[in-house]
Amino acid sequence: MSAVPMGATVPRGEAEVGKPVNRGYWERYELTSQFEGAERIAKQWDLSREELDAFGKLSQDRAIRAWEEDRFGSQVLTVDAPDLGEDGTLADTTHNVSRDEGLRETNLEALAGLRTNMPEGVHTAGTSSQISDGAAAVLLMTKEKADELGVKPMATIVDSCLVGSDPVLMLTGPIYATQKLLDDNGLTMDDIDVVEINEAFASVVLAWEKELQPDMETVNP
């Protein structure tokens, strides 16, 4: 993400980046951002700054604990990443990356002192996704292929679904996707041992929590 032009990283006055927005979109919706969508979600689900900060701290605490317990030891490869000069261009040197860069030991007092992303908003850097780099890979194959190769799968994909969500809120998709998957398979949240929900912004997870009523000890543990 650090090398992708974004609203927060493109210097003012530079040439426009990205692709033109379809005219049909302009006629029906406003051009908005995930920051604004997250704030709308917080307002619609009546989420306070204090609630978001508490979740932000919990998220950091859990991430740090996972690394300290070496949960990812067998899954992470160390890489040599290129250094960037002060002007943002690639340097001739590299640095070693062996763990997530965004972990921060924090407390509620420190989080409460952060400036909000938007005026009158409730999200801060402590409750928003970070701009850092990462990569992941998963090897998928059919059961028949796994049997042929004699490999034991770590997990089985039972079902998936595609849902639509309000393009202005845009981050509410996990709510409807979870509801549909549970309904399609005759399950409830009590049947799920561990849940992973993308923490794009704290309000995304907390709105999902209000709708699904899960045991939050099982969510992104």
Task: Name each model-derived stretch.
Residues 25-33, 46, 50-56, 120-137, ...:
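Active-site pocket-shaping loop/turn-to-helix segments
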Residues 144-156, 187-189:
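Phosphate-handling active-site elements
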Residues 39, 75-82, 158-221:
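Active-site pocket-lining segment
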Residues 15-23, 116-124, 156-163, 217-221:
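Glycine/charged-rich beta-loop-alpha catalytic/anionic-binding loops adjacent to active sites
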Residues 1-41:
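Flexible glycine-/small-residue-enriched beta->alpha junction loops
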Residues 51-148, 211-218:
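N-terminal extracellular/periplasmic Venus flytrap/periplasmic-binding protein-like
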Residues 36-40, 44, 58-65, 110-113, ...:
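Alpha-helical scaffold segments in soluble metabolic enzymes
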